[in-house]
Amino acid sequence: MNGRPDGSALVTGASRGIGAAIAKALAREGWPVGVNYRTDEDGANGVVEEITKAGGRATALQGDVADPDTADALFSALEEEFGPVLVLVNNAGVRADGLAPMIDNDDWDRVVNTNLSAAFRLTRRALRPMIRSRYGRVVNIASIVGAVRGNAGQANYAASKAGLVAMTRTVAAEVARRGVTVNAVAPGLIETDMTEGLGENLLEHVPARRAGTPDEVAECVRFLASDGAGYVTGVCLTVDGGLTA
């Protein structure tokens, strides 16, 4: 652990895609990892198996972060097995796209609750153990949609991600003196299930002329969760191949 306090890392929405890549990256750094999933048990178990085979420690944790009771349940389970959660990555997210007149209240509430409110509840639950340890890393997975720009058909998603960045900066200022950093990563076009079907329209606007990979996003999270990023807080790091340059 290189002098860090003993503890664990929790990654939400980690059964596949960006979340799975982040879980594996943190495990390579020596963190025991809680691999949270909502429905994809096989995917989460596959991530745990890969981490374990590589010499790391991990456990699969079922829970829907949209449920207000899930935060305590996830933390209690992980704390019992691996110790206090000192790295939290709020990655779980959903989309329910549609032009503003067509977004009903349920789709608005579901996206904002999962992408923003759940991240706040998990962060709130994480902060006290981190403050007691005088060490903590919170990384929120935002998006260039909302964090940097709007996108037609995604008013609910953009609002949730813009709010996530605002929350990141505010909480970062509150806990900076306690050895706790709070940052965000805003991916652009990344090869995942959530972005499938968007690539052809966007790729021609990406200066890098390619989509990013989950591993490239995970590497940014790995840095922000590291000892070397102790003076980096309140930042939103875009990972978009120059799309918003």
Regions found by a protein language model. Give the residues of each.
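Substrate-binding pocket helix/loop in short-chain dehydrogenase/reductase
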Residues: L99-A100, D104-V112, L202
